[in-house]
């Protein structure tokens, strides 16, 4: 137990030191994030502690139709500084009555939002749309890092459609390129890109994987889950030479908050069944 606590303390210290020197981004699928979770003092405490590590974070599985939980989250993040975090949130997304939002949290003293838009993947009532939850895309200006502008494309893929949705991210990438004349793009989130949802034989049919323009920063061998499974569901993919050069070597990884904070397995899973995946960009 002492060894686990020491490792957790070292991870936390390393995170603080690295965060002071660069820009840290993450994608975090917080299972069923809504009013119930934010009303639980213990769970909300750790969610805020985790998200406070990041300068830019994309939260997935936001189940908050009236943005009440999002408001509570921002109030807590900003309790010591009312401008510590700002946010951009998508409309509720989904083909049925079940809807989720993408939530972008960012520190305005580190980055600013230049533009945003909702990707149009087709007609949902017609049954010819591509994504269960089509990406909402944000373009950031980052004056403190080597790369000054980049876009973030999130995806929470439907598990049974993971192969098709990950492949279709290539089309989203092209759309962002064309719309903003921008090469430096981060695609990240819970792609469900592992275990039974993407077989080894299927990777060759996924353009986002086979095209050498893309660097996959989270390897297939990673475990991004807090449960007993060992699956690399959550990924970070970067495109654009400036952005790829700006990535701090070996900074991309899942953040195991169970180890870092010395939590029980039960509490860790109550926070979420996923760990955040994170990456750090070099300062200019």
Curated annotation (Swiss-Prot):
GO terms for cellular component: extracellular region; nuclear envelope; zymogen granule. The active site is at 100, 156. The record marks 87 as: Nitration by tetranitromethane destroys a Ca(2+) binding site and inactivates enzyme. The keyword Hydrolase applies. Its cofactor is Ca(2+); Mg(2+). Disulfide bonds join 123-126, 195-231. Divalent metal cations. Prefers Ca(2+) or Mg(2+). Pfam families: Exo_endo_phos (PF03372). It comes from the Eukaryota. SUPFAM superfamilies: DNase I-like (SSF56219). One of its GO terms (molecular function) is actin binding. Its EC number is 3.1.21.1. The record marks 35, 89 as: Involved in actin-binding. It is found in: Secreted; Zymogen granule; Nucleus envelope. It catalyses: Endonucleolytic cleavage to 5'-phosphodinucleotide and 5'-phosphooligonucleotide end-products. Keywords: Actin-binding, Apoptosis, Calcium, Cytoplasmic vesicle, Disulfide bond, Endonuclease, Glycoprotein, Hydrolase, Nuclease, Nucleus, Secreted, Signal. GO terms for biological process: apoptotic process; DNA catabolic process; neutrophil activation involved in immune response; regulation of acute inflammatory response; regulation of neutrophil mediated cytotoxicity. Highest expression in pancreas. Belongs to the DNase I family. Serum endocuclease secreted into body fluids by a wide variety of exocrine and endocrine organs. Expressed by non-hematopoietic tissues and preferentially cleaves protein-free DNA. Among other functions, seems to be involved in cell death by apoptosis. Binds specifically to G-actin and blocks actin polymerization. Together with DNASE1L3, plays a key role in degrading neutrophil extracellular traps (NETs). NETs are mainly composed of DNA fibers and are released by neutrophils to bind pathogens during inflammation. This is Deoxyribonuclease-1. It comes from Canis lupus familiaris (Dog). The gene is DNASE1.
């Amino acid at each position: 137990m002492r060894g686990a606590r020491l490792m957790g303390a070292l991870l936390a210290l390393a995170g603080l030191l690295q965060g002071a020197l660069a820009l840290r981004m993450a994608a975090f699928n917080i299972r069923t994030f809504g009013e119930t979770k934010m009303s639980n003092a213990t769970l909300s405490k750790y969610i805020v502690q985790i998200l406070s590590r990041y300068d830019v974070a994309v939260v997935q599985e936001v189940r908050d139709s009236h943005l009440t939980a999002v408001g509570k989250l921002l109030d807590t993040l900003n309790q010591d500084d009312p401008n510590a975090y700002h946010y951009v949130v998508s409309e509720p997304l989904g083909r049925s009555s079940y809807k989720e939002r993408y939530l972008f949290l960012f520190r305005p003293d580190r980055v600013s939002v230049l533009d945003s838009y909702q990707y149009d993947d087709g007609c949902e009532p017609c049954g010819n749309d591509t994504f269960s939850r089509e990406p909402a895309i944000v373009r950031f200006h980052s004056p403190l890092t080597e790369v000054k502008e980049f876009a973030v494309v999130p995806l929470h893929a439907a598990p049974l459609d993971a192969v098709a949705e990950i492949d279709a991210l290539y089309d989203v990438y092209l759309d962002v390129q064309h719309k903003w004349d921008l090469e430096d793009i981060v695609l990240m989130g819970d792609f469900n890109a592992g275990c039974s949802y993407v077989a080894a034989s299927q990777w060759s049919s996924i353009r986002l994987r086979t095209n050498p323009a893309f660097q996959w920063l989270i390897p297939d061998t990673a475990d991004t889950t807090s449960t007993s499974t060992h699956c690399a569901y959550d990924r970070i993919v970067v495109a654009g030479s400036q952005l790829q050069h700006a990535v701090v070597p070996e900074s991309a990884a899942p953040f195991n908050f169970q180890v870092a904070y010395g939590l029980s397995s039960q509490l860790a899973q109550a926070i979420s069944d996923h760990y955040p995946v994170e990456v750090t960009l070099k300062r200019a």
